[in-house]
Amino acid sequence: MKRKNIALPVVFCCLFLFSLQGEAELNLADEQLAKLEQKYDERAGKRFRAWRELIQKSQSLPEEDKLKEVNNFFNMAVLFVSDADNWGVEDYWATPFECLGKGIGDCEDFSIAKYFTLRELGVPDEKLRLTYVKALAPYNQAHMVCTYFPSPTSAPLVLDNLVGEIEPATNRSDLVPVYSFNGSGLWLAKARGTGQEVKGGTGRLAMWQSLKDRMGKDKI
C-alpha cells in the first residue's frame, strides 16, 4: 500500500488557520480604530495606531526592553490631567481605550495603560502590579505606579509618569508603598517588596471591577 504524505496538508491547514486568526485581529483593530475616531477625533486614531505599532514591534523584545518602550510611549503620548478636570469626578480609573482616546489622564490612567499593554506583550501577570504609594515632597499626595518584579524575591522596577527613568523601588525613597494589586491578588505593602497578600483579593476593589467591566465593552 502506498503511504500518503499527510504533512503537507497539515502545514497548509495550520497556515490557513493562522491567516484567519491574523485577519480577525486586524478586523478587530480596525473596528476599535473606527470606534475611537468616532467617539473622540483623528488624533485619537493616531495614538491608537501608534499603540498598535508599539505592540507589534515590541513582541520579540526582552522583558526589560518592553518596559522601557511602554513606559516611554505613554509618558510621551498622554498628558497629565486630574480626574476632576478630565471627568468631573474626584476619582476615575480610565480604560486604555479611554486614555488613548482623550490623550490625557492621571497617574492611575498612566499605570493602568502600561500594565495592560505589558500584559498584551506577554509579560506574566505575576511579574506586574499596580501599586498605590504616597509621593513625598514636593508632591505630598497619593500616587499610583506600575511595578515589575524581575523575580519573586527582587525589588520591583517602577514605571512612573513623574520620573522618566525606570528605577528599582529601593532607589525611589520619594515613594512610600501602601498596597499593590494585579489580576490575581491584592497585597499590603509594608516595605519595598512583595508585601502581605490580602484575603478576598481584588474583589475588594470596586474601581478595579468597574474598570474590567468597561474594558470588556471596549474590547481593548
Model-derived features: where do they sit?
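Bacterial N-terminal signal peptides that target proteins for export
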Residues: 1-9
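Intrinsic disorder/low-complexity detector
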Residues: 5, 19-22
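Bacterial N-terminal signal peptides
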Residues: 9-17
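A structural boundary/capping signal
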Residues: 22-220
